[in-house]
A protein has these predicted regions:
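Single transmembrane alpha-helix segments in multi-pass membrane proteins
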Residues: 3-57, 63, 68-89, 221-226
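Inter-helical junctions in multi-pass inner-membrane proteins, predominant
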Residues: 3-7, 149, 186-218, 251-257
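Hydrophobic core segments of alpha-helical transmembrane domains in multi-pass membrane transport
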Residues: 18-19, 43-47, 100-104, 135-147, ...
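Transmembrane helix-bundle core of multi-pass membrane transporters
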Residues: 88, 92, 99-151, 205-206, ...
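Loop-to-transmembrane alpha-helix initiation sites
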Residues: 89-90, 116-120, 131-136, 179, ...
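Helix-loop-helix "hairpin" substructures at the membrane interface of multi-pass membrane proteins
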Residues: 128-204, 227-232
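Cytosolic-side transmembrane-helix boundaries in multi-pass membrane proteins
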Residues: 144-145, 149, 163-177, 244-285
Length: 285
């Protein structure tokens, strides 16, 4: 039972961490729709960094490059939104739309290959080690975010920011800087999720993120905008994926079942918004 649970957590780790990234951005009222592109770019940055800094240890410098990229891009687009009144959703979508193109071009330039960039055997981590690290990182991310938002002054302010920024302004909090810092955390978490995807495969492949960034946004809503709820939603989603993948063996149209979790996620968002609207209308009477 414990082994199966840890295996599920390890498999869900990239999605779980990406969902935490989405949740942080939701707290500050600036939904990070660029998570999909950040995951893809960071997966490429992580693999490229490991290969290009092999003489310096490879793994740590490569992951550091990816985290800095994810945090930096998120902070940059947030600064544009806060100080220049740019539309952060358009900026996030631009990261998603251009990410795949950048990865393809840079992959060809650096490695002469626009399809699969694999780590050499000497740089590959053992599968069991990757699974252990993935599970540990998922647990630490979820637990750390929950404790941070509950017991630290900055975390509490981040949760308040999206609901009542005027109150924080009134007590002297620099809300613009807090938004940028929080979105940097969101970008770093998205980058960590992207790196895990590439480390679990030991390679960079086209469309590495495969829609996980979008699913993460759904899970942040489906989890009721709470850390525990978001984690449970991510684990449930991966469990359903596994169950459906097992059930579709021998079926004539397996794609219908494979797409069921995505349809379920969309249904949860629509249902939640409908329930909230009906509740507000009922309370208004």
């Amino acid at each position: 039972m414990i082994t199966a649970s840890m295996s599920l957590i390890a498999q869900a780790a990239p999605l779980l961490i990406a969902a935490c990234a989405a949740l942080i951005s939701e707290y500050v009222g600036l939904l990070n729709v660029g998570i999909e592109g950040l995951m893809l770019l960071s997966a490429f940055a992580g693999i490229s960094g490991i290969l290009l800094t092999e003489s310096l240890g490879g793994l740590i410098p490569g992951l550091a490059i990816a985290l800095v990229l994810g945090a930096g891009l998120s902070m940059f687009i947030t600064a544009l939104a806060v100080y220049r009144k740019a539309n952060i959703y358009i900026l996030g979508l631009s990261i998603n739309l251009t990410g795949a193109g950048f990865v393809s071009v840079l992959s060809t330039r650096l490695f002469g290959n626009r399809s699969i960039v694999a780590l050499p055997p000497e740089l590959l981590l053992q599968p069991q080690l990757v699974k252990t690290v993935s599970a540990a990182l998922a647990v630490l991310t979820g637990l750390g975010l929950a404790l941070f938002c509950r017991y630290t002054k900055t975390g509490v302010r981040i949760k308040i920011l999206g609901k009542d920024a005027a109150f924080l302004d009134s007590i002297g909090v620099h809300t613009a800087r807090l938004k940028i810092a929080a979105m940097g955390m969101s970008g770093a978490a998205a980058a960590a999720a992207g790196c895990l995807l590439s480390l679990q495969l030991g390679a960079l492949v086209p469309n590495q993120s495969a829609g996980k960034g979008w699913i993460a946004l759904v899970l942040a809503y489906a989890g009721g905008r709470s850390v525990v709820g978001t984690i449970c939603a991510a684990l449930l989603f991966v469990y359903l994926e596994n169950a459906i993948a097992a059930a579709q063996i021998g079926m004539e149209h397996p794609a219908l079942l494979i797409g069921l979790p995505f349809v379920l996620g969309l249904f949860l968002i629509i249902a939640e918004k409908l329930i909230i609207r009906l509740w507000k209308r009922y309370r208004g009477k």
